[in-house]
Amino acid sequence: MNSYKADLHVHSSHSNKPTYWAMRKFSVPESYTSPKHLYRIARERGMDFVTITDHNSINGAMEIAHLPNTFISAEITAHFPENGCKVHVVVLHISESQFQAIMELRKNVYEMVAYLHAEKISHFLAHPLYAQNGKLNCEIIEKSLLLFTTFEIKNGCRAHRFNGFTKRLVSSLNENVINRLADTHNLQPYGCTPWIKGMVGGSDDHGGLFIARAHTTVYDTPTVDGFIDAIKNGDSWADGDDGGPLTMAHSLYGVAHSFYRERLGQRRSGATPFVSALLDRFFNLGEEKGSFLDKVRLFILKNLPASRNHTGKSFEEILDSEARLLLSDTAFLEAIRHADSNRKIFAVTSRLANRLIFHYTSRLMTLPYNAGFFEYLSTAGTIGLVHTLISPYYLAFHHQHKGKELIRNLTIALPEMHHKEAVEKTALFTDTIDGINGVAITIKRLISTAKSRGVELTVITAGDEGEATVEGVKRFPSVGDFVLPEYPELKLNFPPILDVMNFIEREGFTRIHISTPGTVGLLGLLIARMMNIPVAGTYHTDIPQYVRSLTNDEFLEQAAWSYMIWFYSQMEEVLVPSVGTREQLRSRGLPTERMKPLPRWVDTEVYSPEMRNPSFWKSRGVGLGRIVLLYVGRVSREKGLEMLVAAFTELVDSGAPIALAIIGDGPYRQEMETNLTGYPNQFTGYLTGEQLQRGYASADMFVFPSATDTFGNVVLEAQASGLPVIVSDEGGPRELMRDGETGIVFRAGSVKGLVDAVRLLITDPERMSRMGQNARDFTLTNAPDINETYNTILHLDKHNTR
C-alpha cells in the first residue's frame, strides 16, 4: 500500500493578525512565510498534498490553488456562545462561497458545525487543550467531544504531554461515555459512531522552519478528493514529531528575524556582521544568503585577533563580539554539527544569552557606590534587554505548561480514560553541594534517603566542569561566578538559565524544592513559576544575620530581609528548622500558615561515645593534661569565633587547664591562628567520616558561640558523641539541647557569659560527665525514625515507593 501525506495545519504570511500583545503592538504578523515558499518546502519534505490554513483567511491557499495537488483550507476562530470560549477549527477543501458562509457563522460554534456537516465539509478541532482566551474548561471539552468527529492529536508546536493526552482522551471514548455526555449537556453528537474519532496532525508552523514536521497520512488515496474522504471516514492518522517550547520559541524567532530584515534591511547588519551571519544561517527563509563581498568581509573580521575585554563597548558591540567568538569556537560548532535545527538554535542562543547576562550582572555587582543612579539604571536596563531578547523561550516554556490544571480536571471528569498520573519527580535546587556546611550535608543525606526509598530526586546545581560527578546531582557548567569578599572560597555560580529550563522541561519534573536563595535557587523559583510547577523551600541559613555580622550595615541587613521574605513568600510552603526561626520569619511578614517544621536529627550509630580515642587529640599536640574544648564548623567571624578566642585566652591566662580544638576551615582561620599563638590549640581543617566522629568523641566539651545558625547539625552530633554543649541563646542550636541538663546556654555576644559557662564545667568534672551522658540520652530519646526524617522535603507519604 502507498501512503500519502499532507500538513493540515500550517500558516503563511496571510496569517497577519497575531494573538500576542507585543506582536500586535509593533504590527508584526504571525508569519512571513510566502505561500509559494511554503508549497515548495512542503513538497521537498515529502508532502503529497499541500494546503494552507491561515487564521480566518483563505488568501494564502488561493495563491497556490493553481499548483498541483493543492486545496483551499483555513483555520477558523469559532466561539462557544455560552461563555465566549474561543476554539480553532480547521476546515478543509472549501470554496470561496463556503468560506464566506463559515465566517458569518463562526461566532456560534454550534451553528457553524451544523453548516459544516450539512455541506459535508471535512474539518477538525485544532490543539483541543490550548486555551485561546482563558475560558476553556471541562464542560467545553466535553461538548467538543460531541460536536467534532475529528481531532488534531499531533500538533507540531505542542508538547507530547498535550498531544499524547489528547490522543488518549479521544481513544478512551465509548458509546456509554458519549451517551452520558449527550444527556449531561443536552447535545446530540455528530457522526454514525460518535465515540470513534478521526485523528490528524499538522505542524502549526508560523515561522517557516518546521513545515511538515507533523502531518497527516492516509493509504491509497492519490487524489485530493480521496485524501479528504479518508479524513472524513476516520481513515487517517497523525504522523511526525511532537513540538515543545523550543519549536514554539524558534518559530517566534523566525518571525522576528523576518520582521527585522523587512523593516531594517541591511542598515543594521554592518554594525553586527556576526550576529547577522548567525541569524541568516538559521532563519533566512529565502534565497538571499549574502553577497560575495559580505562573505569576504566576514571572513576577514572573523580572523582578526579577538578579545573578551568589553570595556567601553556598546551592547551591540558586545553581542557581536560574543557571536564572533562563538563562530570561531570549533569545538562548540563541532559538538552541535549533527544536532537538529532546534538544538543548534537553542545551543547558540543559550550561550550568547548566558555570556551577556553574566557580563552585565557582573558589571552591576561591581559598580562602585558612587557610580550614580543612572549608571545602575542603565546596566540593570541592559540586563532586562537581554531577557527581552530571549523572552520567546520564556513565553514558550510558560505556554507549554498552560493547561496542566485542565488535564487534571479532565481525568476526574472522565474516569474512563484510566489516566496514569505522571511519576513524581522532584528537582532540588541548591547553590551549595560540595561543602561541609549544614546545607550540603542535609542535601547529601536527602540523596541517600531518596535512593533507598525509590524516590526520583535530582539535585540541580552549577559549578566548574572539572568538579567531581556525584550520583543524583545534575551539575550544570557555570557561566561564571561571583566571589563574595568575606567568603573568598565560597562562590555564587551563575547557572546557564535556558539550559536548566530545558532540562526541567525535558525530564518532566513535577515538583521543585529550593534549598538556597542564591543564583541557582532564584532560577529554580523562576522556573517553577514559569512552568506552573509546585514549589517549596527550606530556610537553612539566616542570611540577614550573616550580612549584619559581616558588614555591620543596617541598610544591607534590611535589604537582605526584604529579599528573603519576598523570595520565600513566593513558595507554597517553607520548611523551617526551629521555632525561633519560624517566629523570626513571622515577625518579618512571612505567613505562618506557609511554614512547616523540618524534622532533622542525627545518626546516633555514627556519632557515638564509643568512637572516643584518648590519643586522638594528644597525638595532635593538645589534650596532654588538659580539658579539650571543641568547635566544629565554618571558621568565620559570623560564627562568634572572635568571642571564643577572647573567652578562651582569658580562661587560659587565669590558669584554666584547657585546650582548644578547631575542626573546620574558613576565611577567619589565619587570623584566628595568629590570635591564638602561644596558647594550646589545634586546627585540623575539615575532617570527614571516622576521623570526624573520633574528633567529636575524643573531646571533653563542645562550644558553639554562633548566634546566626538556624539549626546546627554539629550541636546534635556533639551531643550524640557524649559531649556537653555550650550554645548562645539566639538561633536554632538553643532548641537542640536542654539548658542545665545537656549543656549550658549563655547570652549571645557575651564574653563573660561564655567564660562563666566553660568555667562552670571545667571546675565540676562530675557535672560535665553527667551532662555528657544526658546529651547522649537526649539524642537517643528524641531521634525520629531515620526513614521519616526527610519525608517533608521528599513528600514520601505521596509516593508509591518501589
Q: PLM features: residue spans?
A:
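An N-terminally biased module of ancient metal coordination in phosphate/nucleic-acid-related enzymes
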Residues: 1-86, 209
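Short hydrophobic beta-strand element within catalytic cores of glycosyltransferases
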Residues: 724-727
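A short, well-ordered alpha-helix in the C-terminal region of glycosyltransferases
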Residues: 753, 760, 767-781, 788
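Carbohydrate-associated surface elements
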Residues: 463, 580, 601
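Aromatic "clamp/platform" in nucleotide-sugar-dependent glycosyltransferases that forms part
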Residues: 707
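Conserved donor-binding/catalytic core segment of Leloir-type glycosyltransferases
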Residues: 428, 623-639, 645-649
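Domain-core and long-helix interface of multi-subunit machines
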Residues: 3-29, 96-217, 240-244
